Amino acid sequence: MNSIHIHTYPRIHFSLIGMSNEGYRINGGAGCSISAPLLDCHFVLSNSLQIIDQREYPMSAKELNKLTQTIESCIKKYELQNIYKCVINSDTLFPHTGFGSNTMIYLSCIEALFILNGLEYTQDDIVINSTRGGTSGVGIHTYFNGGVSIDLGVDNIKEELRPSSLGARSNYPLQLCGFQAPQWTIGIMIPIHVPSITEQQEIDFFRQNTPI
């Protein structure tokens, strides 16, 4: 196998649940996956690791570097021989617009490593090595199973409340339930001319507004 496509679908996140830092658990969330817009990651075996984001509004250089470091850590951990060039495409699914595209990309990149190297793996292997899922489990659970996901967040060990872009915690969100959503027609309006926030703005928002 020399190349693979991994198609992933966005999630709508209804809410984070526990943001007070006073209970036994923090974060937690509810949301569901939707069938469009599609994100396509095309992986082709290569002599060097390359990540090419061809979307109209791509990841920043800092974000691409962070993704590359995550992939390289996984390569080193498992002593993998097959590396790839990854080309990311989507017509309307851009970073930091509320659909979990970065989580989708990270999970896809780790899963592609396992597939192209012929490794047996579990969902936990993908999540742990992706460093995602540190805030809500909606993105990681819907990546694998679609549908609706409700999770209870993580144990409160008095860590900083933060977005998943700051890396995974020592454990990741416990799913309370997951089930297939009704086949509702959902309309989404994406204002093209309104710039999305940056990763740093997202981090700053959490620091300025939590705990609640």
Question: Which role fits each region the language model picked out?
Answer:
Residues 2-7, 15-17, 21-29, 122-212:
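ATP-dependent small-molecule kinase catalytic core of the GHMP/sugar-kinase superfamily
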Residues 1-97, 101, 111-123, 134, ...:
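ATP-binding N-lobe of GHMP and related small-molecule kinases
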